[in-house]
């Protein structure tokens, strides 16, 4: 092999190794940032991974919200009208958070099948429903409750 050909081969191999490393790092970063959505039924059936960041969503069950008197801790149940999952959250709940409305919680599922959320997203108006929640409710054979007037 002449020196010119050898030099080209080394350059091509170096480029391939560099591209491979870049793709590997990108895939690794994306895999760590992907938060899959799970319904309360999927969580109750054991389909959601434990100790991995997930998104859980559904309708907040009426009468299930319990706030701590001396801290920002909140505990509530979310349902897809088939099964229910408990969510705990430490922080200020969004202004639009209400019982009977759709939410998506981001957090980790613990060993007791309780989602320990570090972020709670509430719908932003009476007509909006997070797409994942709307699909989960449709799949369960239910529809979202009609928006009522609150005053």
UniProtKB/Swiss-Prot annotation:
It holds the Pfam family CcmE. Residues 1-8 are cytoplasmic. The keyword Translocase does not apply. Keywords: Cell inner membrane, Cell membrane, Cytochrome c-type biogenesis, Heme, Iron, Membrane, Metal-binding, Signal-anchor, Transmembrane, Transmembrane helix. Coiled coil: none annotated. GO terms for cellular component: plasma membrane. GO terms for biological process: cytochrome complex assembly. It is a single-pass type II membrane protein. Residues 30-151 are periplasmic. Heme binds at residues 124, 128. GO terms for molecular function: heme binding; metal ion binding. It is found in: Cell inner membrane. The chain crosses the membrane at residues 9-29. It comes from the Bacteria. Belongs to the CcmE/CycJ family. Heme chaperone required for the biogenesis of c-type cytochromes. Transiently binds heme delivered by CcmC and transfers the heme to apo-cytochromes in a process facilitated by CcmF and CcmH. This is Cytochrome c-type biogenesis protein CcmE 2. It comes from Pseudomonas fluorescens (strain Pf0-1).
């Amino acid at each position: 092999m002449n020196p010119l050909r050898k030099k080209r081969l080394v350059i091509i191999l170096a480029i391939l190794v560099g591209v491979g490393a870049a793709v590997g790092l990108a895939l690794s970063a994306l895999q760590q940032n992907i938060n899959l959505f799970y319904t309360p039924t999927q969580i109750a059936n054991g389909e959601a991974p434990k100790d991995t960041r997930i998104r859980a969503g559904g309708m907040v069950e009426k009468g299930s919200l319990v706030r701590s008197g001396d801290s920002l801790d909140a505990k509530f149940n979310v349902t897809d009208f088939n099964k229910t999952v408990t969510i705990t959250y430490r922080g200020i709940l969004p202004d639009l958070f209400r019982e009977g409305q759709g939410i998506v919680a981001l957090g980790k599922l613990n060993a007791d099948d309780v989602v320990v959320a570090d972020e709670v997203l509430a719908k932003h108006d009476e007509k909006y429903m997070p797409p994942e929640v709307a699909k989960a409710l449709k799949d369960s054979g239910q529809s979202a409750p009609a928006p009522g007037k609150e005053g």
